[in-house]
């Protein structure tokens, strides 16, 4: 594995750990969800790097996934939800698309679960 790919995965793992710790507190669903999005983004960018391409300077998971969908298959609906989260959880309620401005506990848990599965998938694919 190329060193730059390993770096992306190490940063993804850090975001995943943060998300896992934060999601246990119902008042921290926003940062838990944000770190889930960041984990997913870094996992996808690791795959882009492994293909010898430069990752785009974007946080749009759908766009990044479009570069790697022949290599891995993931739930695009979840990527779309995480795209919304990236903006929604960083600004006051009413500025984003979420009804209450923050994800529910269940949504945050789903985001962490998705980030975990994506991290494992990418790690397994790139380790072989």
Task: Explain the meaning of each model-derived region.
Residues 1-128:
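Terminal alpha-helical segments
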């Amino acid at each position: 594995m190329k060193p730059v790919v390993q770096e992306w995965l190490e940063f993804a793992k850090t975001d995943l750990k943060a998300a896992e710790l934060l999601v246990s507190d119902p008042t921290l669903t926003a940062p838990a969800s944000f770190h889930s999005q960041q984990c997913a983004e870094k996992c996808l960018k690791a795959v882009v790097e492994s293909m010898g391409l430069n990752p785009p300077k974007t946080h749009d998971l759908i766009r990044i996934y479009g570069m790697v969908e022949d290599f891995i298959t993931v739930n695009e609906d979840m990527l779309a939800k995480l795209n919304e989260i990236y903006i929604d959880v960083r600004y006051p309620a009413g500025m984003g698309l979420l009804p209450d401005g923050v994800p529910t506990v269940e949504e945050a848990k789903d985001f962490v679960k998705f980030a975990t599965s994506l991290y494992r998938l990418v790690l397994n694919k790139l380790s072989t």
